[in-house]
Each structure stands twice: as C-alpha cells, then as structure tokens.
C-alpha cells in the first residue's frame, strides 16, 4: 500500500472487485492474473469502507490535513490512536493508563468537528478525572473548543448541557439526573472513559447511558482493563457498542464464556479470551512499554470529593482552627499538628488526644483506589501516612481478592525484607501499602510501575525518594504517580510537592493559607 500525491491510496489485492464494486471513486489500474492494483480516492468515507473490508492498515485522512493544535506535539502512539478513532464510528481504546489517551481522543474529536461530522461531543467519565484529566487535556490540546463541565445542581448541569459549548463533560452518576436534557441535546459522539463502570447492563447507570446511544451515534469506549476480573465484565460494554453481537442476557453470556465449578464458583473457558477479543473490535491498545517516546515518569491527579461525613468533620475542625489562628502564639509545630488532623480526616481516620481512632466513611476514595489498581498492568505501591488507615485498606483490598502486604513503622526489618523480596520476585500483581518514611530510602520496588498517594506527605524529600522506589535503575516501563486529593489541604500540599517547594516552604504560612481558603 502507498499514498499517491496525498490524494489516493494504491492497494494490491487478489480480490479487486471487492473494492471497485463498493467504492465508486476507485479503479483497477493493473492486473497480473493473480494480484490487482487498485487506486482509491483518499477520503474519510473510503477509509471507513476499506477498514470494514479488512484493510485495517489504511491510514486515516487526519494524517494529511490536520494541524494537531495544542501546547505540545503528540507522541507517535497518540497520533495512531487519533487516526484509529477518526476511522471508526464505534471503537474501543484499551491503551494503558498513563499513555495519553484523553489527548488522543481530544484531537480526534476536534478533527471530526472540523469536518462537520461531529456536532457536539459528550464525555462520560469518573468524577475524579473530569477536571484533572479531561478539562486540563482539552485545554492543552484543543483550547479553541468551548468545553463545559456538567456538575453541581440539576439546574447547573442543565445550563451547561443546553449551552452552545462543543464538548460537555459529565460524570457517570450525573447522567440519570439530567437524562431527559441529554437525550434532547444534539450529541452525536459519546466518549466513555473508564468504561468498565458500565459493565453491568442491569444497572440504572448502564440503562441511562444506553438511552443516549442511537444507531447513528459515534461511540468510543476507553479502558485499560476491559475484562479485568472476569470475561463477563465485557458483556455490558459490548452490548452497548454492538448489541447484536452478544446474547440477550448476561447469564446466557456467562454460560458461553465460563463454566461452573461449584455452587458459587465459575471459571473462564479456555477459549473465553479469544472470544472476548473477537467481540471487542475494532480496538486499539498501546502499553507503556510500547510507547518508547513517553517520559519516564508521569504524574496524574484524581480529584475525589470527601464524603458528607468527612466534609462535615473537616469543616468543623477547620472552623475551630481558624478561630485560634488569630492567636499570635501559634507556632509551626501547632500548625503541623493541626494540618495533620485535617489530613487524617481526608485519609479516613482521626487519632484523638487519648490515642483512640475515629473512623470515617471514605468509600469514594477507596473506590478510586480500586479503579487505579484495575487500570494498572503491573503491581501497585500505595503510600499512606497513617498506620490505622493502612490496616483498614489492607483488610478491604484483601476482601476483594488482591494480593496485599503492608509496611509501616511497626513492621520489623526482617519482615520488611521478606515483604519487599516477595513483592519483587513473585511475578504476580500485588498491592503494597507503605508508610512513606518506611520505604523512602534504599529500597528497590520496580516490580510496580504505578504509585498511588492515598494522602500527601509534607516533605518533598520523602515524596521524591518514595517515588524513586519504582522509578530507578532496572525499571523497564514508564511509571505513573497518581495523587488522590479531596480537600484544600491536600491540594495545597500536592501543589507544593510538585513545585519542589515543601522542604523550603513556611509551614505556618501554608497552614494560614489553607484555612483562609
């Protein structure tokens, strides 16, 4: 195959009639008795037809007539992903976490809008990445496109949807709230990020999304782990994308891809993965190992609001601290103690002056942690400052059948050594929960390529050294550091850490800044 004058594609095939009878702007230019040479006018429509005929390597027209706007140049794998999306009205993107698939989708959306193929786009994603991933990436890539975030009250959501912005971002649980408004709007492209959130077709969430997808709707589903726990996880995704491809019910589908071992135990059939692979097409996937042009370490922010219980206690504490702020005798030590209390609330448990522990509902943060773990193809390190929270997380993750270990100040040196050795050498995907100070120096843990900060530290040295446990000699994959934040003190600290200021900043000044908003 070759491109001629940026206008036509030359293809060699044993069956030229398959092309010339379907594509009007094509002609047979040579036939040697076995193989024909066909010239095809290079347009978006002909590319899609050729892909459907099996010529999947035919490049998208985005390659010849798009300027790739934005503040940075796309990586090769991002260009390939954008090309793929533009060429496929219904498609899956299975690129691994940290490979920049949101930017690739943004460019594809913009290109289709410039061609007047897509009128408006609806991005459906978790609340935690509405701003930190989608809004930020859209601003960096297609800043000329008006973007609105449909979040807040029902009226606020409706106002954004009914406005004239090109791209609307909404979280999964917000869809049902304004479903009628969304249905009446003219979205003809729907992008579902972290699509495993709609893997069950019996949920209200799936049913709401399904009402937005019409036969002529462009639909792109994005996830790094399409069937992480079970082949059945693919059912809801495929039914939304191509309902004709799957059984009528999830139970029938389960029977097709799994077999029953005992009353409560099912196992995948030998051919299940191959069957799922055939169903979930067309698809594209890049792992971080394949993306040779990626930076060695990537930073992400996941915004996870505090639960109502946490927010109430956090606000009460902050108000009390604000009252004492006028006291000139307050010191950096007092500030550090108070700031630590706020961090404890956000983390899920507060230590009282008598040593007791008050637990808080931190369900949303835990769900986000599970999402991140599911997205990662390798083991994961989770840094958490508080011992009680580590114990809570270990119990919850173990209950979800993850292989989990923990290291904190109460773990002996010999036991730590055994845990680190097992983590490095087992070859299994594991979760290691660590107090940052317990493994911030001299330990190699590059069996992981994802680090999660459940809550921030106040020391840049600790932050940098802890991240270096994964990003060090011997690491063969690009690494991702995910900062989870849900309150003012966390946002301020992460910003200071990323600006490498926390070893020098005025702790008292930062504390005052946090309380004053």
Regions from the PLM with identified roles:
Residues 458-517:
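A conserved SF2-helicase RecA2
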Residues 61-94:
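Conserved pre-motif I regulatory segment
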Residues 175-180, 229-231, 390-394, 416-420, ...:
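SF2 helicase motor core recognition
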């Amino acid at each position: 195959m070759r491109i001629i004058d940026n206008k036509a594609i030359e293809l060699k095939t044993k069956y030229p009639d398959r092309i010339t009878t379907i594509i009007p702007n094509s002609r047979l230019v040579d036939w040697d008795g076995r193989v024909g040479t066909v010239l095809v006018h290079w347009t978006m429509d002909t590319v899609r037809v050729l892909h459907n005929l099996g010529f999947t390597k035919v490049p998208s027209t985005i390659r010849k007539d798009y300027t790739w706007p934005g503040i940075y140049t796309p990586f090769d794998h991002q260009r390939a992903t954008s090309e793929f999306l533009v060429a496929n009205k219904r498609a899956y993107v299975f690129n691994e976490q940290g490979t920049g698939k949101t930017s690739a989708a943004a460019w594809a959306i913009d290109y289709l809008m410039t061609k007047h193929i897509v009128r408006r786009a609806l991005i459906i994603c978790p609340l935690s990445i509405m701003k930190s991933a989608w809004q930020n990436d859209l601003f960096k890539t297609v800043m000329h496109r008006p973007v609105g975030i449909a979040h807040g009250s029902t009226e606020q959501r409706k106002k954004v949807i009914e406005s004239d912005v090109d791209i609307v971002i909404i979280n999964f649980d917000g869809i049902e709230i304004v479903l009628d408004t969304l249905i009446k709007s003219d979205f003809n492209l729907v992008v579902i990020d972290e699509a495993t959130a709609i893997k069950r077709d019996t949920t209200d969430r799936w049913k709401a999304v399904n009402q937005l997808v019409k036969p002529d709707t462009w639909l792109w589903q994005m996830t790094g782990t399409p069937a992480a726990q079970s082949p059945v996880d693919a059912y809801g995704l495929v039914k939304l994308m191509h309902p004709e491809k799957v059984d009528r019910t999830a139970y029938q589908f389960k029977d097709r891809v799994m077999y029953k071992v005992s009353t409560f135990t099912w196992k995948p059939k030998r051919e299940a993965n191959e069957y799922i692979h055939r169903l979930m097409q067309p698809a594209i996937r890049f792992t971080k190992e394949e993306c040779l042009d990626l930076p060695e370490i990537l930073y992400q922010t996941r915004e996870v609001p505090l639960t109502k219980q946490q927010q109430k206690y956090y606000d009460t504490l902050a108000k009390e601290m604000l009252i004492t702020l006028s006291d000139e005798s307050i010191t950096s030590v007092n500030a550090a103690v108070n700031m630590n209390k706020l961090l404890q609330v956000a983390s899920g448990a507060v230590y009282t002056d008598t040593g007791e522990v008050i637990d808080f509902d931190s369900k949303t943060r835990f769900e986000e942690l599970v999402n991140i773990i599911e997205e990662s193809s390798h083991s994961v390190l989770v840094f958490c400052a508080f011992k009680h929270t580590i114990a809570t997380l270990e119990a919850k993750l173990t209950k979800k059948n993850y292989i989990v270990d923990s290291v904190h100040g109460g773990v002996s040196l010999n036991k730590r050594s055994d845990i680190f050795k097992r983590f490095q050498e087992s070859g299994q995907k594991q979760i290691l929960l660590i107090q940052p100070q317990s493994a911030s120096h001299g330990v190699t843990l590059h069996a992981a390529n994802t680090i999660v900060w459940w809550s921030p530290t106040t020391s840049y040295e600790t932050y940098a050294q802890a991240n270096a446990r994964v990003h060090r000699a011997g690491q063969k994959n690009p690494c991702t550091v995910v900062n989870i934040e849900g309150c003012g003190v966390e946002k301020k600290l992460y910003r200071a850490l990323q600006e490498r200021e926390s070893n020098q900043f005025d702790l008292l000044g930062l504390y005052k800044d946090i309380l004053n908003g």
